[in-house]
């Protein structure tokens, strides 16, 4: 299955899931625009459509839909365009504002990046919408971290940060995200012990 097909299949899955959970038609329209915007750079920048970052916009949205039951199109749209791992894949804020509006752009701008010195403080003091986007976006990166080629240093830092920052924030935010982070932290700790 080629990149366009994999991207289109993910877009269809996002729309189908959103529709089945009751996201209104206008929300699905905004979400579809956001997903397409999040995929644009990936389609050109990533040579391999099986790269762990390729389907990230849709996977982050699906975490919010399936695990949180989030139906807020602004939160879902923000999750589709936030990128905390690869600056080359980030959608510029001006473009987000132009395509998706001020509210989505403001939410994206409020999501702290994992390398921020004040990450824990920023997440703890953020409103729930910011925390939901940050937790879902990061969880997807963490879930696919084992696919990062020979990057043991990233894995160690990611596990430490997930355990000490993201997991406690998940506890304050949503029970299902807490379960997901707890499971990931346990599983990844075992992987690190073996490597």
Describe each region flagged by the PLM.
Residues 1-195:
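Active-site helical microenvironments for divalent-metal-assisted chemistry
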């Amino acid at each position: 299955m080629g990149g366009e097909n994999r991207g289109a299949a993910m877009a269809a899955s996002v729309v189908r899931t959103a529709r089945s959970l009751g996201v209104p038609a206008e929300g699905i329209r905004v979400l579809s625009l956001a997903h397409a915007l999040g995929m644009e750079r990936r389609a050109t920048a990533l040579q391999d459509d099986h790269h762990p970052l390729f389907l990230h916009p849709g996977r982050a949205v699906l975490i919010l839909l399936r695990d949180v039951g989030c139906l807020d199109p602004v939160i879902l749209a923000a999750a589709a365009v936030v990128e905390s791992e690869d600056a080359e894949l980030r959608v510029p804020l001006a473009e987000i504002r132009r395509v998706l509006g001020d509210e989505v752009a403001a939410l994206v701008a409020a999501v702290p990046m994992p390398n921020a010195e004040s990450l824990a403080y920023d997440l703890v003091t953020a409103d729930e919408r910011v925390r939901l986007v940050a937790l879902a976006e990061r969880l997807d990166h963490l879930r696919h971290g084992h696919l990062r080629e020979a990057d043991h240093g990233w894995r160690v830092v990611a596990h430490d940060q997930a355990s000490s920052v993201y997991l406690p924030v998940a506890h304050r935010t949503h029970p299902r995200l807490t379960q997901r982070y707890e499971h990931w932290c346990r599983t990844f700790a075992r992987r690190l012990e073996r490597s």
